[in-house]
Amino acid sequence: MIKKEFISDWTKEKIGLPADAPLTREALEAYQVKKLRETVAMAKKNSTFYGRLFASVDPERDIMSTKDMQKLPFTSPADLLAEEEGLLCVRPGEISRIVTLETSGTQGKPKRVYFTKEDQELTTAYFWIGLHNMADDTDRALILLPCRRPGSVGDLFRIGAERMDVFTIPYGLPGMRELERGNKGNGRGETFKQELEELLKLMAEKDVTFILGIPGQVAALAQLWTEKRAEAQDPLIVERLEKVKASMRTVLLSADYVSAEARNAIETAWECKIFEHYGMTEMGLGGAVSCYVLDGYHYREADLFFEIINPETGELVKDGEYGEIVFTTLTRKGMPFIRYRTGDRSRFLTEPCPCGCILKRLERVGPREK
């Protein structure tokens, strides 16, 4: 059974509230202030980069409320590119995974984000908790994100899903086989289409009820289903395609902007619920996710602190106003990020969510500027 209140209960446990106590903004913000102080102090002590950046900062004196974070300088992807290991707060031997992100700047030098085993467990736990809002132990989840390497995003999702007894089908990122064969096209050639056709067969064979994937790829899969269904004459093919639609209940889109066209293609094909996830590698992969109301994203306030700033002035905007998302990690040990500018545009939704959860909501995040 889907447990819609699970994320609130988990947050209460994370911040140290008794099970019978209500989750309040006051309790949550007191926890965040404590964690912000601890994070800044830990980073200042253990990181050469943060040691320089926060040389004049005394967390116990300077961070008395969450609003005091605006006194601290920003960090950015440029700092990660320039410093890399200077942001580390643990010995290299404590790092269990390094994620490399290609960039267009600094002559194509990649960004590298470092995680300890404990950091990755935070992500797995978040995936596990978030899934309680949209899936249960009757689901059969097709994972269309990288999942072959231990600790990859799809692998962490698999572990989280299996903790709640969801049957998982770790497939990987569609289109990778085309690239492995040397086709450097746009990922929409005949080989890619053939792979999508194979995926539709797999969905029917495995009674897939849930898909996790990138918006454009899941939309392409749904569009192909629509085309195949419109032209199908063979009763066996019709039966297989209808079986896919009858089984599908939920799609979780992640890793990219969700366009209206992508949503429409999926809804037209399968008439299923579409949840959206917002995150980035620097956040620890998981950032914020739709609740069952499907209006904005609740963000993981026990692990992250979000601010919305005016990108021109760097000043905080009022709740409800648009600006750039800035985040600080509260529980990361290997490579914490403090007031990290994402370049993503959104706003905090000020109306209470009908789901009853008090965790702050972001409006749907727009496409990231290149």
Where are these regions (language model features)?
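Generic structural marker for isolated residues within well-ordered, non-membrane alpha-helices
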Residues: 100, 128, 158, 211, ...
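Conserved S/T- and glycine-rich ATP-binding loop of Class I adenylate-forming
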Residues: 43, 103-106, 141, 211, ...
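N-terminal Rossmann-like or analogous alpha/beta NTP/dinucleotide-binding catalytic cores
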Residues: 126, 153-160, 179, 184-188
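Conserved AMP-binding loop of ANL adenylate-forming enzymes
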Residues: 131-168
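Short, compositionally biased "basic patch" segments
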Residues: 94-109, 153-167, 200
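Nucleotide 5′-phosphate-binding alpha/beta core
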Residues: 1-102, 108-133, 205, 246, ...
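Active-site glycine/GP-rich loop and adjacent strand/helix microenvironment
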Residues: 1-28, 34, 38-39, 164-370
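Alpha-helix N-cap/loop-to-helix initiation residues
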Residues: 120, 149-151, 192, 259
